[in-house]
Amino acid sequence: MKIFLSIFPVVTTVALIVPLPAQEKPARIPAGYMAEKIETPQGVSLGVGGMEFAPDGSLMLCTREGEVWKYLIKKKQWNLFADGLHESLGLWIDPKTSETFVIQRGEITKLVDTNGDGRADLYESFNAGWGVTDNYHEYAFGLVRDSKGNFYGTLNTSLSWPGWARSK
């Protein structure tokens, strides 16, 4: 154990100083797909938690920062659709009606643009039955809907750290 600890800093230093060779071959894109670079909104950090295409072809993103952004592909333009959410990490858009749902830390929320200005002005709590604590690692991820209309997501659970994990 002592040898490992004395060698580790040297190995780490070497790894940080010696750059790894760059990959010379470009990534292969599967048939039927294309890659496109999309610039993010200026001054905005997009910690993307969910992505979904709307029926109009626009790309919607929800972020850990609690925002939902809409990217108009043809115009190459970003619009903020919703903000003030609590770590929105999953998004589902109805392919027929464009109804937009987001899962945030404590609930599934339906976002509605009631006046047609491109911004959600109604945040309707659709389901908030699972509870939430103040633990940093308690997240709600992903959002899918089955053919019967049921939503599914993934919940992280909080954990009292680290009493049980410490060795004596």
Segments the model singles out, each with a brief description of its role:
Residues 1-3:
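N-terminal secretory signal peptides that target proteins for export/translocation
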Residues 6-19:
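Bacterial N-terminal signal peptides
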Residues 23-168:
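Beta-propeller blade termini and top-face loops
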